[in-house]
């Protein structure tokens, strides 16, 4: 990839094809990017680095995931009952 | 006196298939009564009927074979096929539970956090009690083979000792598993981990108990000198069943206890 992350974010239209999730059911695509956003943010802020690259994952999950799921997971994270490993 | 000109066993009319079928019907409908109408009567009656059926039917088979001589080598051959086919059906039964386990654990769903074991589940250490249980069952496989050879070599006392050891090991396994169940931090209603774990190991434990009972019946029969050194199919059937139980445990140990942790 010859684009920088800033360029990729600027040119973002919608979630691109992800070969890890080739089929019609994109649930895991949504969930994986949701997890990756929070993991990325946690890791980069722990290192004291600007978490801008994590924004990619946020864009993708916001494009893919149903809002109700995101709200549910956000609430679970706040209550400490989120099942994923962040 | 008319003789039969074939080696097959034409069994006398018997009520036990009917009572067995009736008890199976009452068991299933009794289960529904228990679930939906909070009534234990039907299922309780069906269990009594089932136990009576088993006792009397197998007693009759012993009478026909050991005392009346109806079990020619041809009859014994068909009994062997029967036991083998039954064990094959049991393999199919457990195959389903292993399928379920691998379905849930190979690609865990987002509801489980896409991880296995799921967050919050502390799996049992496979190298503590489960490893001991593996050694116990493997050892009991050795002792039951010793019992078989003692039987074939006409050393009655050795056979009684080695079969008793096998039974004691079976009971020891059951007690240890019971302790593990009591002391585990998760139960059957804790997500897919709990379901797969307890259904698979639970049915296995039930089969250990059945196998132990079968071996105990063989011990009692040996003490009453039912078996000869060349004709002892009841014992062989029990030993096959016991080896099957051991093999299922090995698969459980490797898949659920070890890989699944």
Curated annotation (Swiss-Prot), chain B:
It catalyses: 4 Fe(II)-[cytochrome c] + O2 + 8 H(+)(in) = 4 Fe(III)-[cytochrome c] + 2 H2O + 4 H(+)(out). Keywords: Membrane, Mitochondrion, Mitochondrion inner membrane, Translocase, Transmembrane, Transmembrane helix. PROSITE patterns: COX3 (PS50253). Belongs to the cytochrome c oxidase subunit 3 family. It comes from the Eukaryota. Its EC number is 7.1.1.9. This is Cytochrome c oxidase subunit 3. The keyword Transcription does not apply. It comes from Myxine glutinosa. It is found in: Mitochondrion inner membrane.
């Amino acid at each position: 990839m010859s684009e920088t992350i800033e360029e990729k974010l600027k040119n973002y239209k919608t979630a691109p094809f992800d070969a890890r999730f080739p089929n019609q059911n994109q649930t895991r695509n949504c969930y994986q990017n949701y997890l990756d956003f929070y993991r990325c943010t946690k890791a980069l802020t722990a290192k004291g680095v600007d978490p801008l690259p994590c924004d990619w994952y946020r864009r993708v999950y916001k494009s893919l995931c149903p809002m109700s799921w995101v709200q549910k997971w956000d609430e679970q994270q706040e209550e400490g009952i989120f099942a994923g490993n962040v | 006196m008319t003789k039969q000109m074939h080696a097959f066993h034409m069994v006398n009319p018997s009520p036990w298939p009917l009572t067995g079928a009736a008890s199976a019907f009452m068991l299933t409908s009794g289960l529904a009564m228990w679930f939906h109408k909070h009534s234990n009567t039907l299922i309780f009656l069906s269990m009594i009927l089932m136990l009576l059926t088993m006792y009397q039917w197998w007693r009759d088979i012993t009478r026909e074979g050991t005392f009346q001589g109806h079990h020619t080598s041809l009859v014994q051959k068909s009994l062997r096929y029967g036991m083998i086919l039954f064990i094959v059906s049991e393999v199919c039964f457990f195959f389903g539970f292993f399928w379920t386990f691998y379905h849930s654990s190979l690609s865990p769903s987002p509801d489980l956090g896409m991880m296995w074991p799921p967050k919050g589940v502390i799996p049992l250490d496979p190298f503590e009690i489960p490893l001991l249980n593996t050694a116990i069952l493997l050892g009991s496989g050795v002792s039951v083979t010793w019992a078989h050879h003692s039987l074939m070599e006409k050393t009655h006392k050795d056979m009684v000792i080695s079969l008793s050891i096998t039974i004691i090991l079976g009971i020891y396994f059951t007690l240890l598993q019971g302790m593990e169940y009591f002391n585990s931090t998760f139960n059957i209603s804790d997500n897919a981990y709990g379901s797969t774990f307890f259904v698979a190991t639970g049915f296995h434990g039930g089969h250990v108990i059945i196998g132990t009972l079968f071996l105990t019946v063989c011990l009692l029969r040996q003490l009453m000198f039912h078996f000869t050194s060349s004709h002892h199919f009841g014992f062989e059937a029990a030993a096959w069943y016991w080896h099957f139980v051991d093999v299922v445990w090995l698969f459980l140990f490797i898949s659920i206890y070890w890989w699944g942790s």
